[in-house]
Amino acid sequence: MSVSAFNRRWAAVILEALTRHGVRHVCIAPGSRSTPLTLAAAENPAFIHHTHFDERGLGHLALGLAKASKQPVAVIVTSGTAVANLYPALIEAGLTGEKLILLTADRPPELIDCGANQAIRQAGIFASHPSQTLSLPRPTQDIPARWLVSTIDNALAMLHAGALHINCPFAEPLYGDMNDTGLVWQQRLGDWWQDEKPWLREARRRESDKQRDWFFWRQKRGVVVAGRMSAEEGKKVAQWAQTLGWPLIGDVLSQTGQPLPCADLWLGNAKAVTELQQAQIVVQLGSSLTGKRLLQWQATCEPEEYWVIDNIEGRLDPAHHRGRRLVAKIADWLELHPAEKRKPWCVEIPRLAELAWQRVVAQRDTFGEAQLAHRIRDYLPEQGQLFVGNSLVVRLIDALSQLPAGYPVYSNRGASGIDGLLSTAAGVQRASAKSTLAIVGDLSALYDLNALALLRQVSAPFVLIVVNNNGGQIFSLLPTPQSKRERFYLMPQNVHFDHAAAMFNLRYHRPENWEELELALASAWRTPATTLIELVVNETDGAQTLQQLLAQVSHL
């Protein structure tokens, strides 16, 4: 019997089973122990293959692919610390709902805890963070192929959101010519190999029913809070709220068009908070809210009912309101709960939103970080998409900009880390093949710098704007000790990104005014290549501008 040949047949069943559940993208890191999985993926024509030498970046690449494709994405890595490097992307997927299937090669059981090289305890390594975990046995013909395929099918059928970790031990030899070893074992699956359906099909109904008292609540004074959702859902939510006459507080990720812009500014005004206290019901569609003032209001508001609608399971309400947690796709829920045409009940908030917007517009000519956030709408590629980084930049865009309704916006706002942002953006672009504008801070870019390798080949124009304010200026907004702030919080690195762009053969610009930025963008959108645009800005102006605007709007 050829161990290497049967390893490959075992792996081929696993990979073929994935195709029956919508997996088309497979992300592969180099490794020896993962050879059976890698070769099975390489030989399966149903897959689009992506490779990267860094497993942490590979996991985030898969995360971006899953975000844009809305399909599960597979990841193949070898044993050892390669597995642990998938942890950040797995955690993010668990919080934002993207489906990742992590195929981790492993040493066989007899090589664990005995000093064997590159052998760690991989079973259960991710603790409670995966939605599903599957520890397969060592490949053996004593286990029928139908057990293997039905086990994979069952795990994928139960995967509603987040990651499925499949640990796959393989014994040596890992290399060798294919022969007939295991062919009969494999052929016992019959015409399944020519079919397109799973071996085991399970129907799972889990969406919330129609709320029968909706006709009663839609006649009340309500507020709509829009969190993370798809572009199509964002447009529908905006129309739904407008028909109801309810104010819509739209997060930067809501894609609703934010009809009441600058919410994170005007929510700091006591008049707005007082008017919102009249709301009898708050309907929150989507999770992952960004704005600090929005989160503060959400934590203190006390409507009669607080409903949270999201396709992800779990509470999703850190304020623990009395109300309803409804698990459903937002578009489906809106269809079951139509709006009734009513006049707007809020008067003060639209006025405050307009005045706040005017204050922001008055400062747009200065070349700086806050002004870029406000202007970002003008720089979006036509028929394209936006990827927003974390820390200060996403807060500035949320507070100071008004993105178009239905324009695709992506980010990693689950755990909200700055790791893997460039890799995630690369995955979003690969899955959608759209022109992409990504904007991150300098520390975020440094953290994921080797992901620039993923941006060397793109199918459409990709612009990466690195806002270089020399450190983690988000901490300037927090009451960090002044004497310790620079060394222990901001950590300025005093670097520029021209050499990084050159190392990966990317186009590079460092504009010093708006005209130069617009010329660089105009050139970038004409070519299917990556352009890195570094905006060197005053270190503290972005945070200070936000604080000044908050103070101004609070006294309107």
Curated annotation (Swiss-Prot):
Enzyme class: transferase
Keyword Magnesium: yes
Pathways involved: Quinol/quinone metabolism; 1,4-dihydroxy-2-naphthoate biosynthesis; 1,4-dihydroxy-2-naphthoate from chorismate: step 2/7; Quinol/quinone metabolism; menaquinone biosynthesis
Cofactor binding note from Swiss-Prot or TrEMBL: Binds 1 thiamine pyrophosphate per subunit.
Record-annotated disulphide pairs: none
Gene Ontology biological process terms, A to Z: menaquinone biosynthetic process
Keywords: Magnesium, Manganese, Menaquinone biosynthesis, Metal-binding, Thiamine pyrophosphate, Transferase
Annotated EC: 2.2.1.9
Catalytic activity annotation: isochorismate + 2-oxoglutarate + H(+) = 5-enolpyruvoyl-6-hydroxy-2-succinyl-cyclohex-3-ene-1-carboxylate + CO2
Cofactors: Mg(2+); Mn(2+); thiamine diphosphate
Stored InterPro entries: MenaQ_synth_MenD (IPR004433), MenD_middle (IPR032264), THDP-binding (IPR029061), Thiamin_PyroP_enz_TPP-bd_dom (IPR012001), TPP_enzyme_TPP-bd (IPR011766)
GO molecular function: 2-succinyl-5-enolpyruvyl-6-hydroxy-3-cyclohexene-1-carboxylic-acid synthase activity; magnesium ion binding; manganese ion binding; thiamine pyrophosphate binding
Entry-linked Pfam families: TPP_enzyme_C, TPP_enzyme_M_2, TPP_enzyme_N
PANTHER family for this protein: 2-SUCCINYL-5-ENOLPYRUVYL-6-HYDROXY-3-CYCLOHEXENE-1-CARBOXYLATE SYNTHASE, PROTEIN PHYLLO, CHLOROPLASTIC
UniProt record similarity statement: Belongs to the TPP enzyme family. MenD subfamily.
Known role: Catalyzes the thiamine diphosphate-dependent decarboxylation of 2-oxoglutarate and the subsequent addition of the resulting succinic semialdehyde-thiamine pyrophosphate anion to isochorismate to yield 2-succinyl-5-enolpyruvyl-6-hydroxy-3-cyclohexene-1-carboxylate (SEPHCHC).
Record's subunit section: Homodimer.
Protein name: 2-succinyl-5-enolpyruvyl-6-hydroxy-3-cyclohexene-1-carboxylate synthase
